[in-house]
């Protein structure tokens, strides 16, 4: 028999037990930043192969957009105003990792005087790259997400992906 809200202690314990059984998703929050030429900002992480969009993993109970802003401050020493959501991607379990939800936010266009350099040990390099060259630098999974983010930006509406693919 389930407790009722009339018994607050029993009710809260019941809800806590249910919450403990719910799925926990890892959350990634990246940002699409471009320069005046339309090139995309990529970063080269020191802890994994290949290039990536700036951003990273959310901490426990941290909203994705705040995680994106925090990561940009930590990694590139920049406070960026996010201009909206571009992509939500459900990423299937792979390797040792459970599934995750990956977000890409629109960071807008940076002025020429806003050169970005790595600010912490997690990145070795940051550079603006033409989109067609980015494909060869990022993982296939990241490429699908990045390509969708650019399409979403051009279409003016966010996209939902399932493991990097549309048409689910």
Regions found by a protein language model. Name each.
Residues 91-115, 149, 153:
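Active-site-adjacent beta-strand/loop module that shapes the phosphate/pyrophosphate-binding cleft
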Residues 49, 121-168:
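Nudix hydrolase/Nudix homology domain
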Residues 1-30:
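Acidic, metal-coordinating catalytic segment for phosphate/diphosphate chemistry
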Residues 20-23, 95, 118:
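Short Gly/Pro-enriched turn/cap motifs at secondary-structure boundaries
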């Amino acid at each position: 028999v389930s407790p009722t809200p009339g018994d607050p202690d029993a009710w809260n314990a019941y809800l806590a037990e249910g919450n403990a059984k719910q799925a926990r998703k890892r959350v990634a929050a990246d940002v699409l930043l471009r320069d005046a030429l339309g090139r995309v900002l990529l970063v080269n992480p020191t802890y994994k192969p290949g290039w990536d969009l700036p951003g990273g993993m959310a901490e426990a109970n941290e909203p994705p957009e705040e995680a994106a802003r925090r990561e940009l401050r930590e990694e590139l020493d920049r406070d960026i105003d996010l201009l909206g959501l571009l992509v939500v991607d459900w990423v299937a379990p792979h390797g040792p990792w459970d599934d995750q939800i990956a977000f890409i936010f629109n960071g807008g266009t940076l002025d020429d005087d806003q050169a970005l350099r790595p600010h912490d040990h997690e990145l070795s390099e940051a550079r603006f790259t033409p989109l067609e060259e980015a494909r060869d630098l990022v993982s296939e999974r990241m490429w699908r997400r990045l390509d969708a983010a650019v399409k979403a930006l051009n279409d003016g509406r966010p996209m939902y992906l399932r493991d990097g693919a549309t048409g689910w």
